[in-house]
């Protein structure tokens, strides 16, 4: 292709056409996060940079955003496209455990205590026996991959969810009914990713503007004098 077509072919790499990782990826994860929590966050902060891809792009190649809800719960979005070790996935983490939707698995937070022998080895490796009693550890570390988790539906998912998306689309066409709250979900996914991008650009904490709130979940629209 002609070099003159570069910006049109790779439009996702330029702020003129795209907001980069926030609009191309984060919007989907943010929608899932607010759906899972049944809440919309109140503020966002973060940082973005171009640290690896020096190919002329002007959108960030790595971003990190923290969305904060009114009760202190946080939803984070991190993307580093120069490393694919962890892939693309969501993790819903709470005091009782963790859910990984892509894998269809959940992991209980409470696990069986370490066997006495493992505890002894751990104490020895950390030289607890040479320390004062109050300085020793009272637990044995457990790496994440030792907790195998359980499948949410009792067995490994048979697909990656693509077929479910197609089935939902076909059902909407046949019944001529939109999925519930699809407009509200789409609106807030768009607003959250754009607000996150603005926070990255301005390097400051931004609150969700009252004038853009609609009647959905924990948000209420603000009635202006003209609208009353």
Predicted feature locations:
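Acidic/polar loop patches that form or flank catalytic/metal-binding clefts of enzymes
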Residues: 39-47, 74-78, 99-102, 178-182, ...
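NAD(P)-dinucleotide binding in Rossmann-like oxidoreductases
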Residues: 55-57, 71-161
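Active-site-adjacent bridging/hinge elements
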Residues: 2-10, 138-145, 162-170
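Active-site rim elements
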Residues: 16-23, 49-53, 78-80, 150-159, ...
């Amino acid at each position: 292709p002609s070099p003159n077509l570069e910006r049109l072919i790779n439009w996702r790499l330029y702020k003129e056409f795209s907001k980069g990782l926030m609009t191309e990826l984060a919007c989907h994860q943010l929608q899932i996060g607010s759906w899972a929590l049944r809440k919309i966050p109140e503020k966002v902060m973060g940082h973005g940079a171009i640290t690896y891809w020096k190919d002329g792009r002007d959108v960030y190649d790595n971003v990190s955003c923290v969305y904060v809800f009114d009760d202190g719960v946080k939803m984070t979005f991190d993307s580093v496209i120069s490393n694919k070790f962890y892939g693309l996935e969501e993790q819903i983490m709470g005091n009782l455990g963790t859910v990984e939707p892509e894998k269809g698995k959940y992991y209980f937070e409470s696990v069986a205590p370490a066997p006495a022998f493992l505890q002894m080895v751990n104490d020895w490796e950390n030289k607890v026996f040479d320390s004062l009693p109050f300085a020793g550890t009272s637990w044995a570390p457990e790496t994440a991959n030792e907790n195998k988790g359980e499948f949410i539906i009792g067995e490994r998912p048979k697909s990656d969810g693509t077929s479910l998306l197609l089935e939902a689309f076909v059902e909407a066409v046949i019944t001529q009914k939109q999925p519930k709250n699809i407009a509200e979900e789409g609106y807030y996914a768009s607003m959250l990713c754009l607000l996150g991008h603005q926070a990255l650009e301005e390097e400051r904490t931004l609150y969700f503007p009252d004038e853009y709130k609609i009647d959905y979940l924990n948000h209420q629209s603000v009635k202006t004098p003209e609208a009353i």
